[in-house]
Amino acid sequence: MEQRTTLDWLMNWYLSQCDGDWEHGDGPEIRTIDNPGWRLKLPLRGTERDGHEFTRFSHNYEHETNWFTCWTENNEFHGAGGPLQLAEMIEVFRSWVTDVR
C-alpha cells in the first residue's frame, strides 16, 4: 500500500509494532501543549529502535509558532513543536526509523 501522508505512515508503523504485547504498554501519544502546539511521544521498547539514541534536533526553536524539537529519553522518541509542526516531527521520526543500519 502506498503511504500517501505522514499520518498514513505513522498509522502503518503503529500497526506493524502491534504483536499482541507491545500495544498493551505505553502506546504512542499525541497531545496539545499550551504554547500552542503539539507534543509527540512514541515508545521504542520492542521496536527496531529499541535502546537507540536520537541526538536532540531543533528547528527554529526561538520562533513563536514555526518551531520544533525532537529527542529520545527513557527509550521513547519525543517531539514538541508549534501548531503546524506535527507532521514535521513525525517526518523526523519516520526518517530516523527508516534509516536503520
Tell me what each language-model feature is.
Residues 4, 13, 47-50, 61-62, ...:
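Extracellular/virion structural assembly segments
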Residues 1:
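Acidic, glycine-rich loop-and-strand cores that form catalytic or ligand-binding grooves
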Residues 18-58:
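Amphipathic, interaction-prone secondary-structure segments
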Residues 57-101:
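Helix-rich interaction surfaces within compact, conserved domain-sized segments
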Residues 4-6, 11-21, 77-78, 85, ...:
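Eukaryotic low-complexity, non-globular regulatory regions
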